[in-house]
Structures are given as structure tokens and as C-alpha cells.
Amino acid sequence: SLPERSRFNRICNNAFCFLQWIRIGILKQHSNNPKYTIIDSLPLPLCQPIRNKRCKVLTDYADIGYNATKKQYYYGLKGSFEAGSDGHIWAYTFSKASKHDIKMVEDLLRQYRCQYILADQGYLSNELKKKLEKEGIWFWTPSRKNMKEKKQENSKFLKKKRKYIETVFSK
């Protein structure tokens, strides 16, 4: 017989770490450790924008966030992913749509740490960069056009490599 619902939820929560461990083990067997990883997030809308205020699906986990590429608000979740240079997803996490990308980096790094990380402008933070430097992680984000100190790190090569995760998302 099946366990009751609360017991089933506890079993699933306890199994999550074990399943992550198995997933990383399989990835390590079938692909080399990546030289660098790319971090990005994507919106996961649960309803059409017109229904944002009335939606009752997953109210404990979802809320209203802003999709900058479409320039519109959406009700749903946000998925944050860390993909290797070969396109495999090494770490992932889901959060409320309103949670800022910077706050998800630590969750991703708990699952898989890489010495070199590329990210987009949504992860631009001096605090985060300094914190990761202390931990021995090189964290690259392109600088914005209006920034006073434009860094030399804005190379076309790194920007081209960062586009790779967008291709993974579109599959």
C-alpha cells in the first residue's frame, strides 16, 4: 500500500539529496568536468499574464515576477541553472518568480562548484564577486553600458560562450 501523503512528502524531500548525488555521479561518468560553467535563469510562467492576480496554482511556491526580455510581469516560478561548457546541466534550482538571480547562486554552488563561472548582467554584484573570489571562484559578468568602470573582461569570446546556455534553454 502507498504511504499517507505527509509521509510520502517526507520521503520525497529526503530522497532529493540522494537523487542529486546520483545525477552528478552519472554526469561525471559520461562527461568530463567542465572547464567553466554558465549560470542563467529562465521564467516558468504558470498562467497567461492577464490572469496573474487571480491565479491560485502553487500559491505557496509561485508569485509574480518580471520577465525583462518580454518586458512583462508573469505568475510562476523561476528556474536557475548551471550548465557546463558541454551543455550538460550540472545544477538547478527553482524559486519564486520574484526572487533575485543573485540569491540563487549559492544554491547552485552548493550542488556543483566550478572554478570559472560565466553569468549575465542579472548577476552583476560586486559583493557576490568578492565573496566568490575569497572562495577561489572566478565569476564573470558583462558590465553594463552605463557603468563608469568598463572592465577589459568584456571580451567577445566570453560573451559568445555565455550565449551557449540560451541555446540549451531553447531546446
Features from the language model and the residues they span:
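Short alpha-helical elements
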Residues: 1-171
